[in-house]
Amino acid sequence: MIRLKLRTGAIAATVLLLVAGAAEAQNVRRVAPERLTGYWFLTNKSVNPDVPNTGKNLDQPTCVAVTYMIGSDGRTQNPTIAKVEPAGDLGQVGVSIVKQLSYVKGSQNGTAEPVQTYYVTGFNLPEDPAKKAAILDKCKLPGYQTT
């Protein structure tokens, strides 16, 4: 009986923590990438992503959008593939890039407030600026503050 009560209590505590975490995540400001510098400045000059040797559509012009949170310490958290266009195996490369990003707080972020944002990167993009922009535009995500 005691074990059962402890397990039930542990399960209830876990559920409460998950609900509290989800509620906290919903309160994080969502900022579009083009507005991010008011909140956080990227400090990386380069990254060294993990790139697969084989996979689907690795040689096609592709855009990848990865959502993530920038924590109060300037580190990225919870990178998640949001979109890969066309579908293929380059999404993990985008996650690998985001995991390496680091930030310092911007002028509008005196308390180092965490924000939710996303990163778009392209692979095998054409030289023509209009064609390149058309591919990258496919990975813009709705629901992020743009003003």
Summary of predicted features, one role per range:
Residues 10-19:
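Bacterial N-terminal signal peptides
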